[in-house]
Amino acid sequence: MFVVHSMRLFTGASFRRNLMTSRRLSRKSCLSDSSTLEYSFSLYNKYCVTKKLKIKTICSFIYYYLTITISTIKNSTMSAKHLRPNITHIPVKRSYANILYFGRSAQLLETDRNAGWTKAHETACNGNLEDYEEEYKEMDKHEIDVRDGFGQTPMWIATTRCNYRNYVFLKKHGSDLHQKDYQGRSLLHATANAVNSECLDIFKDLIANGVDLYQKDMVGSTAIDELKHENSIINYETEGTLLVTNFFIFLYKFTYKFIKKLLTICYCIFSIHFFSL
């Protein structure tokens, strides 16, 4: 009976209560004072070892997670530094379509795509739409968002050209910010491929106005996927400042891993505490 009660001493709320119980049991079993003291010290040592094991295990998990997190942030920062150019603006030509978007002259736009190419498209590309304020006041919405052969509107052209003034002007006159071209690409897709500080302002404004960052085009690519390409605003800096912080991408990329590791740590702590009872 004494042995059974001694095993239960480890399930008490505190060592003091366990110690009082051991003394009471020792008196009942006619144990000497020296035996009681020796047993109390052994109980205390086991209690300390168990508690130290818990603390050491928890600290090990925390140290492991912080090490992984710091190394990940460091690697992402270093990879971004290797991609920083010395000039501010670099044209992106990942495809024939991008060559048309960022054409060096209007001659690149004289193709079959321009069945619907208008003066508004040309001005959004190379001019200032604010000069046509009076004409836009009399336009309907479908006239403002007139499409060319690729399904692109003046708003799309202004966005891909990183013309923030034309973007704000068309937005003020009711242009649809949730529009898509014939390939299912949103304005965020177009902005993500640019390397201009004004395109970052447009990118942020589109997100603030509720444009879906995870909207997919016809090939299943999202604006986040476009940001992962080398020729995107995420990999360039203007005047010494990164256009998009590495922390934003880090949160997006490692949120799932963070939650998974956190649950693993909680499970281990619970298991250690449960089996030590």
From Swiss-Prot:
UniProt cross-references to InterPro entries, sorted A to Z: Ank_Repeat/CDKN_Inhibitor (IPR050776), Ankyrin_rpt-contain_sf (IPR036770)
Keyword check for Secreted: no
Species in which this protein is naturally found: Acanthamoeba polyphaga mimivirus (APMV)
UniProt-recorded name of the protein: Putative ankyrin repeat protein L81
Domain of life: Viruses
This protein's record includes keyword Repeat: yes
Keywords: ANK repeat, Repeat
ANK repeats: 150-179, 183-215
